[in-house]
Amino acid sequence: WTTASIMSGALIERVRLSAYLLLAVLLGSAVWIMDAAWGWSGAGWLTTRFGFHDSIASAVVHGVAGAFTLGVLLNLGPRIGKFDMAGRARTFRAHNTHLTLMGLMLIFTGFYAFYGACLVIQSIAFPGWLNIYLSPTTLGAIAIVITFGFAGGFTGGWFASKGDPFWTLSGGLAGVISVSAGADVYHPSLAYLLSISGGMLAVYAGVWIERTLRIDDAVGAVAVHGVCGFYGVFLVGIFAGGFPTGLNNVPSSFGGQLMGMMAFLPLGFLSGYVASWLLKKANLLRVPPEVELEGLDMAEFQQDFFPEFERVPETVVLPDGEEVESAPVLLEGFAQVTNGHRPGVRVEVGGEEGRR
């Protein structure tokens, strides 16, 4: 379910629920199972032959899910109005920044349990070392690495984004993902320094993916999880080489980490791309433009996301930095997508009604 939840945020506002559920089943029940057997199991071929080291699933969970998501996004396409006629990206403001930041904080607290669950695989590979209840020493090691990873990620995200709230907190998430692969061997001070670079990398990668590749990743999942997930196993090859890994105690190495990256990247990306391409050809991947513009909550459930509050006009930030109401921008994008061939479609955007 973790891999599927990573994908969900990137696809919001335009993917069909049925298509997402099919992709989630494929990613969480097939692709992830395969890569976990290869590089996370103590008897996996990547660990026993090449010493691939990914203790808390930087690439096994986050990297593969990010690569899968990238493949889906290429077929799904951007949201209406995300890019102008020149291909420059616009920024959609969050409808509630407080809830956005609260959600990120809930993810942070969940990581403490997620790390503990990841260690169960080591109790299978090395019987008697750990148990499902863990121990005070193990819990302390988990907590300190996670905490330092978040702290460093916050620092890097804050500097790279110049204090942007979303990217500052996302940088904390990217930081802990960047040190997850070597969390069992890193010194806390090293984890802090490496996570700073991970937080900064997520911001730069997110901007590059949006502005250069023109891919609309609504929450930066590819940058935070995909890029930083593979960055995490890359760092192990540099800063944690020589540690015994797997049942055969093969030492970890830079080459072994690259081998794991070369196995996981195409596994995730090609699976997501091919599956979403088939759904696209069957016209099952994306909702119709008028449904996207109205909003999936309103179209499917006739229910606004905050029914207890009056809806206010939403805003969008243009490429030149000017903030304007989103309704005219989205209606213009809707006309471009439909080529003006859908007269009489009634839409409501940000509290404003219009007809095309």
Please give the residue ranges for each predicted region.
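Hydrophobic alpha-helical transmembrane bundles of multi-pass membrane proteins
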Residues: 1-356
